[in-house]
């Protein structure tokens, strides 16, 4: 056996990636054990950050991809990022993509910054090999081929991609999801679905993970149309969006973890999130970003279900905002073990009593089964210390109080640490842990 064949596969792949297609092909005549490795291209990447026309280097890159197809090479991962694209360049790009698809690509990433009438080649939606696909950004997916079918696709990421609804062809978004029989994860970034023409429904019986992230939070005065979520097998849900007018259908029966950030963008809202709140019933880990999001559980408190499975709750809080909504959540979470909050709520300087009426002396904590409490924004003020004392006196099951303190002064750190460790605790098992950040 030759010495080259003894090299690890990772080293061989690295050597091959530095060679031209022609040079790499010649290697199979040098070492028989390189034959299978040479025919596999681990990654092919092209990044053009210029705003001008496609460079000659991309045309050379496209030629190499064509040679790889002619030599029956396979491409594991392909990434194409173009800062701009004009009509005259559409054919060059799409021919390159067709060659990539014929090379049996597994991981396909496209970031083509175009605002015109550009359309992806239809073969994108009939690729039998691709397992992970990322599409972006700015173009429209209007019509899918009738034979659209992505039998191996498990992860689909859409970045600032818009969809259209045709009276004859129907909803292109719905058709795309239906063409993915094993899809497990869907990520929609830059989601301004009021700009979409679609069915306003995310429906899948097999989807496990869904992320919807809005990038623009400016309200232009238009209404935010309803969205339905019919995803009974979903286990992970990350939803950062503006509030919708309503959520007609919400089926999230298998939900394990949910992260929500739903700020209100305008006064006089007509939104209705009752079904969305009810749909979270089976969640085990719930993270609520933005104070507005938690406030929804107070506004629609009659719709809040009993969270039998919830054991970890993380919420955004502010020292000047009442805890009425947090009380609702705690009362509806009989098996909660871990609670993470940002700031403690208290009255400001000059008040005789720093404890707000909404807290009712913290008596509502007596029935809470919380074992771990984390406070991530603590300044060590007298009013804050008083709130911690009340908390420790009322959480009977508490095992760990973790407090993050923002200070860099050594003497201040020592004083805060000493004050916290001196506070009485209702639970003899409770330990106080202070982290300075």
UniProtKB/Swiss-Prot annotation:
The residues the entry assigns to the signal sequence are none
For this protein, the record's SMART domains field holds:
FBD
At the top level of its lineage, which domain of life is listed? Eukaryota
Q: Where is each F-box domain found?
A: 1-49
Q: Which Pfam families match?
A: F-box (PF00646), LRR_At5g56370 (PF24758)
Task: Write down the InterPro entries for this protein, in alphabetical order.
Answer: F-box-like_dom_sf, F-box_dom, FBD, FBL60-like, LRR_dom_sf, LRR_FXL15/At3g58940/PEG3-like
Query: Can you tell me where the transmembrane regions are?
Result: none
Q: Please state what the protein is called.
A: F-box protein At3g62430
Gene source species: Arabidopsis thaliana (Mouse-ear cress)
